[in-house]
Amino acid sequence: MLMQHTLTQLKALKLDGMARAFEEQSTLTASTSLSFEERVGMLVDRELAWRDTRRLERLLRAAKLKNPQACVEDIEYRQTRGLDQRIVATLAGCDWVRNAQNLILTGPTGAGKTWLACAFGQQACRQGFSVFYVRVARLFEELKIAHGDGSFTRRLAQLAKIDVLILDDWGLQDLDQAARNDLLEVLDDRVGTRSTVITSQLPLEHWHAWLQDPTLADAILDRLVHQAHKLPVKGDSMRKKTKSESADA
């Protein structure tokens, strides 16, 4: 009776991890040999682990990663990809996020840029940072709608609070003047305070021409490329490789 009352109180306090551990202890005879301090310590440890797990789940749901299973441990380092394992390991530490620096992934279509961006995004979530993935074209569609319904300022504020904003397929489609202005607004709110990840088939040296407006291009690239980590990805299409391996299996 007392045990059930304690469980009910723990759940009422939203100490779900501790409640589960307490219930487990009551069914294990080995727990009786532990001291009071040891048992309490185990309960607290379980609660902390439970909260960490729930927080990670919330962050990953909010991130909306295109490849939610991508993780840095599964990155392939074939020589043809040109990835430096030491650089990747450094990026996996997420100091670039803590220092509000950006990450630019460039390479041919299918080379795995989006997957890598999602892997770094998941790693950032693991370390407690908020992440959001969006394709560039989709972002500007949403911002155009936000202008129309009066939610643009609120949406900008939301984007400004995200620790790691992943902009996928940069340079794939031309931007109109309104989109270029919106892009500057988004990046200006983030410079020096938050990190932005870019994936692009377009080589970095072509970005200025893609943005068309020289003045805006200078302002946008200054905010984005300054102190950015650049990770070029080489090699054949990873999508074709995966299909080929599936066919051979």
Curated annotation (Swiss-Prot):
SMART domains (UniProt xref): AAA
GO molecular function: ATP binding; ATP hydrolysis activity
GO biological process: DNA replication
Gene3D superfamilies, per database record: P-loop containing nucleotide triphosphate hydrolases
Keywords: ATP-binding, Nucleotide-binding, Plasmid, Transposable element
Entry binding sites for ATP: L105, T106, G107, P108, T109, G110, A111, G112
Pfam families: IstB_IS21
InterPro entries in UniProt: AAA+_ATPase, DNAC/IstB-like, IstB, IstB_ATP-bd, P-loop_NTPase
Protein family (similarity comment): Belongs to the IS21/IS1162 putative ATP-binding protein family.
PANTHER family per record: ATP-BINDING PROTEIN RV3427C IN INSERTION SEQUENCE-RELATED (PTHR30050:SF4), CHROMOSOMAL REPLICATION INITIATOR PROTEIN DNAA (PTHR30050)
Entry protein name: Insertion sequence IS408 putative ATP-binding protein
